[in-house]
Amino acid sequence: HSAKMKGILKDSLHLSTVSSVMSEKNSLAALESKWGKSALTMGWTAVPSALFFLQGTLSISPVAFNVLLNLLAHWWKVYEWPHPSQESLAIRMSVSVRTVQRGLAELENMGLITRRKTSKEHPKYKGRNIYDLTNLVESLNNLAPNIKDKLSQ
């Protein structure tokens, strides 16, 4: 991790902790009024709007974008990268494992994610890949202000 990324993650962890303590009930109430309580029984995922606006700029294909959104749904803790199985992503997306692998390879080749392999003996990850999103976070932080400026012109 770069020092800048650690700072961003530390700041976002601090801000999310402070804001979640202060407004967790308010934001949950807002989400429930928007989506309904039942729709949120499996939780919810926060995704920066910049990612949607930058999909075309970054040339992320629809399949790779879907894979990325599914990875984000598994990113629960700031310092713990998502590690879903490719098979579970394929089932959720109703595509083949190979299609998921192509989407992951695209994101990796673009430099947005870094795949880290684990051993089958690892007590937690059990051979699943860990998907490091550092580059995605840095890209969004670098590109979002520019896209916002362009949109407001």
What is each stretch, according to the model?
Residues 1-99, 106, 126:
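Short recognition helix of helix-turn-helix/winged-helix DNA-binding domains
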Residues 14, 152-153:
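Short coil/turn motifs at helix boundaries and re-entrant loops, enriched in small/polar
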Residues 25, 96-151:
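Winged-helix/helix-turn-helix nucleic-acid-interaction surface
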